[in-house]
């Protein structure tokens, strides 16, 4: 997936700015997670989703993705008590592999394997119901398929002591990616 963070720390600890004459790369190899022990045990929330969760439409480097905004609000309300992990990947689907492994396939690696996860906000599905990109258009998943996928995720999370929270799929009628064949399902 594309890296949408450009923040870089320089020697004095502040965030790098363009004027610092530091080359800021927009696509780069990154460490996917850094785990640190702490004295208190915060509530760990994983945001599992697609490009909406990843922050594909946020201004690059702004931390304008919804998990970062949620994290900032929670830090204001209850400092150091909640950690939000962004596990969004552009193009991700609940059931089928797209640009990446499906949410079902990556659930163990990206959520369950993380230590002390308490809750998961699942914001996935718009890519499943859109057509598959073929010509002629082929319908994506239907409502029954989606419910089955969501149930499988919920059951796996519950069996690991993690509370799932489902977000509503956003409407997409009128967007440049709207497909009547997908909306009919």
Language-model regions, residue ranges each:
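Short hydrophobic segments within beta-strands
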Residues: 48-49, 87, 167
């Amino acid at each position: 997936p594309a890296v949408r963070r450009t923040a870089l720390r320089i020697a004095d600890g502040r965030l790098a700015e363009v004027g610092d004459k530091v080359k800021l790369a927009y696509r780069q190899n990154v460490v996917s997670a850094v785990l640190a022990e702490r004295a208190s045990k915060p509530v760990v929330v994983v945001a599992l989703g697609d490009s909406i969760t990843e922050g594909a439409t946020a201004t690059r480097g702004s931390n304008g993705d919804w998990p970062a905004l949620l994290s900032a609000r929670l830090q204001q309300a209850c400092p150091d008590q909640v950690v939000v992990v962004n596990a969004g990947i552009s193009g991700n689907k609940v059931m089928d592999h797209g640009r990446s492994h499906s949410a079902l396939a990556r659930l163990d690696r990206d959520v369950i394997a993380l230590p002390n996860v308490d809750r998961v906000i699942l914001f996935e599905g718009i890519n499943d119901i859109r057509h598959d990109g073929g010509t002629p258009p082929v319908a994506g998943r239907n409502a029954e398929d989606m419910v089955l996928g969501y149930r499988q995720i919920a059951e796996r999370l519950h069996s690991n002591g993690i509370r799932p929270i489902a977000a509503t799929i956003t409407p997409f009628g009128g967007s440049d990616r709207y497909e009547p064949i997908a909306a009919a399902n």
